[in-house]
UniProtKB/Swiss-Prot annotation:
Comp. bias intervals (Low complexity): 177-194
Polar residues bias spans: 203-222
Stated name of the protein: UPF0441 protein CKO_04429
Family designation: Belongs to the UPF0441 family.
Region called Disordered, residue ranges: 177-222
InterPro entries assigned: Biofilm_formation_YgiB
Pfam assignment, any one: DUF1190
Length: 222
């Protein structure tokens, strides 16, 4: 009887341990997942031009100039394109638009349209995000940013990327943390945007960002 009792106790202890290890394992998994999420973020600085970057990074003039020029090229490739100057100005404000260089990401059929109508128009690059420089000046990336000076636009006074994602007030010199995906190259613009179309994208992205932030806060608060 004693041996049987001992066996039952051992079985009970094994069963109890198995049941109670599961939450611990889940907690450990959650910690590793959280660490993985943290590693997916990147600290970036926001600059208006190469001079701003050079002032903040003494001795890195060449790297700052390269990053700025690369951001300009990326802006030409990915910025929203408009069929007319008026459409662009309606979205971004007077003095904020320029003619898009030929072959700046547009599909051949749209290039033909541009040749017959004059040219496409795009917003000026208002600034750019730049990843923190690593040792030796390597390992940094850049992302062009746009901003509207039309109070009626959802992009008014904000820094947005080519997809319409909002990065807060259009104030250079700031440092912020963004997902690494924010620094990934955006798709080339292959079609024109209708008047107000980019502003709609900014509004939708802002709504999604607020919703995601609210969900995250509720989850953390229980």
């Amino acid at each position: 009887m004693k041996r049987t009792k001992s066996i039952h106790h051992a079985s009970f202890r094994k069963s109890w341990s198995a049941r109670h290890l599961t939450p611990v394992a889940l907690a450990v998994t959650a910690v590793f997942m959280l660490a993985g999420c943290e590693k997916s973020d990147e600290t970036v600085s926001l600059y208006q031009n190469a001079d701003d970057c050079s002032a903040a990074n003494p001795g890195k003039n060449a790297e700052c100039t390269t990053a700025f020029n690369n951001a300009l090229k990326e802006a030409e490739r990915t910025a929203p394109k408009y069929a007319t100057r008026e459409d662009c100005v309606a979205e971004f404000g007077e003095g904020q638009c320029q003619q898009a260089p030929a072959q700046a990401g547009m599909a051949p059929e749209n290039q033909a349209q541009a040749q017959s109508s004059g040219s496409f128009w795009m917003p000026l690059m208002a600034g750019y995000m730049m990843g923190r420089m690593m040792g030796g000046g390597a390992g940094f990336a850049q992302q062009p940013l746009f901003s509207s000076k039309n109070p009626a636009s959802p992009a008014y006074g904000k820094y947005t990327d080519a997809s319409g994602k909002n990065y807060g007030a259009a104030q250079p010199g700031r440092t912020m943390t963004v997902p690494k995906t924010a620094m990934a190259p955006k798709p080339a613009t292959t079609t024109t945007v209708t008047r107000g179309g980019f502003g709609e994208s900014v509004a939708k992205q802002s709504t999604m960002q607020r919703s995601a932030t609210g969900t995250s806060n509720r989850s953390m608060g229980g």
